[in-house]
Swiss-Prot record:
Component of the general transcription factor TFIIH, composed of a 7-subunit TFIIH core complex composed of XPB/SSL2, XPD/RAD3, SSL1, TFB1, TFB2, TFB4 and TFB5 which is active in NER; the 3-subunit CTD-kinase module TFIIK composed of CCL1, KIN28, and TFB3 which is active in transcription; as well as TFB6 that regulates SSL2 association with the complex. It is found in: Cytoplasm; Nucleus. This is General transcription and DNA repair factor IIH subunit TFB6. Induction: Expression is positively regulated by ARG5,6. The keyword Metal-binding does not apply. The keyword Transcription applies.
Length: 343
């Protein structure tokens, strides 16, 4: 096979005449065949052969992809098409974008949401701020609980499996209990499950008059603990596996996981709203000294955590062979990010 000549190129200032172009002769076409021993014969009509090969490769890749994402019943219907591309098979399952969990249900099935609604502190006084001694005890207790959770998590990685977390569910329950404790110190509500309800069905601190909320504050920086929990949560989740679990167990675990994300999101929205609502209070007012909520540094730090979680969690679920839950994934920290980006 002779080496083809280098084609002539137009000069820098030369205008090409696109209507006067020479076609390739048979010798040039033969020179294009880099594998003369191949059974594929390149000719002037070789475009049909190339397109056919490309279509076969694309079809095979799509076929393998669909077998991974769909049920056996779907694959049977898919194979009966005799390699005829159907518009339905080229689309994602509609069910993957529908809610998989009942967001309004409590984190624990034994909890009754009707018993968790705030009682407006009996309609008398605002939540009492903790004294310095109480704040010190609070900090010591939360630090100890975070350390206990971290220690049990490390033990479950192989050091002492019996004393560690056997699965992700008990870890989520411990984190949820700690979130409830921290939230109680802020809102004086014993269980944060009521935040899963719609705005119309709950009465929480952020629904009060901003002028009323700015006059007092039981917040002394507890948000930093909630931010740490949110930061550690995705790191904990990625160390567990779902591959040997039943479908019902997977759904139950993911239900608790998403609800914990939604509760944290709602709390962060409330703490962010408190800062925003209190802007109405004059700076000379004594109430402005007791504004409750996340500061600018907390918000910037939390934005990075929220965006990182929204990226890493779908990747982790896909690595575990779990598909769907697109609706729940799209709602993770959605409320907080909307508020934070509006500043």
């Amino acid at each position: 096979m002779s080496e083809p000549n280098t084609p002539l190129h137009a000069q820098p200032n030369e205008q090409l005449d696109l209507n006067n172009l020479n076609d390739l002769d048979e010798k040039d076409i033969d020179d294009l065949n880099l594998d003369p021993n191949s059974d594929v014969e390149i000719s002037a009509d070789s475009g049909d052969v190339v397109n056919s090969n490309i279509d076969n490769v694309i079809w095979q890749r799509n076929c393998n992809k669909k077998r991974r994402y769909h049920t056996p019943e779907f694959n049977d219907v898919y194979n009966e098409t005799n390699n005829t591309i159907n518009d339905v098979t080229m689309l994602d399952d509609v069910d993957d974008f529908q809610p998989r969990i009942n967001v309004s249900s409590p984190f624990s099935s034994a909890t009754k949401l009707s018993e968790l609604l705030p009682n407006d502190h009996n309609g008398t006084s605002h939540p009492r701020r903790l004294s310095m001694s109480q704040q010190s005890k609070f900090i010591s207790y939360v630090d100890d609980q975070l350390l206990q959770i971290q220690r049990k998590f490390v033990q479950s990685r192989g050091l002492n499996i019996k004393n560690g977390y056997a699965s992700l569910t008990p870890l989520l329950q411990d984190l949820k209990t700690l979130v409830d404790f921290v939230w109680y110190s802020i809102a004086h509500v014993p269980n944060s499950d009521y935040l899963l309800q719609s705005e119309e069905k709950r009465h929480c601190p952020d629904s009060r008059n901003p002028k009323d909320t700015c006059g007092y504050s039981s917040y002394f920086g507890q948000g930093s603990y909630l931010i740490k929990i949110a930061d550690d949560l995705i790191d904990y989740v990625e160390k567990f596996t779902f591959k040997n679990m039943e479908d019902s167990e997977i759904n139950d675990t993911l239900s608790k996981l998403f609800k914990l994300f939604f509760i944290l999101d709602r709390i962060f929205v409330i703490l962010t709203d408190d800062n925003d609502n209190c802007k109405e209070v004059p700076k000379t007012s004594s109430a402005s000294k007791n504004i409750a909520g996340l500061n600018g540094t907390d918000i910037v730090r939390l934005k990075g955590i929220a965006e990182r979680t929204r990226v890493r969690l779908p990747i982790f679920l896909e690595s575990q062979g779990i598909h769907g839950y697109h609706y729940e994934l799209s709602k993770i920290y959605e409320g907080f990010l909307d508020h934070a980006n509006s500043f």
